[in-house]
């Protein structure tokens, strides 16, 4: 969705080559995570700040991840989760996983279900305060009711 066609073709070819390598060696190539998980500006800025604070942080992921994500579509299974409870938490300003995607999953999920849309946060801002406390509050309340 966020790649040009030629980039998509190149990524699929690299994934195919990596799949063949995994079949013969059991190993996957590691690449910079931004090659696979294209960040929005806010996410890129947060990641750069995190790397400055922790230069030893791992910034690579296996190419195998491409196959794992291309081959999975949550819309195919979300309606099969019920009657197990499912909590969707998204953020209003998420530009990586648009809130509409969570809303679509929620619409197709069976009960019990809940959708929380946090106001004013981007994708990775939910992992730090004050958003983190909101996420944990919703999560603990949900677990308290359904565990």
Give the residues covered by each predicted segment.
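Conserved beta-strand scaffold positions in the cores of enzyme catalytic domains, especially
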Residues: 115-117
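Conserved alpha/beta-hydrolase "acid-adjacent" motif
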Residues: 95-101
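Short beta-strand/loop motif that positions the catalytic acidic residue
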Residues: 81-82, 87-90, 94
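Catalytic histidine-centered segment of alpha/beta-hydrolase-like enzymes
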Residues: 121-134
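C-terminal alpha-helix
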Residues: 138-146
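Alpha/beta-hydrolase-fold enzymes
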Residues: 1-51
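Short, conserved loop/helix-junction motifs that constitute active-site signature segments
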Residues: 79-82, 107-110
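Active-site nucleophile elbow and catalytic-triad environment of alpha/beta-hydrolase enzymes
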Residues: 61-78
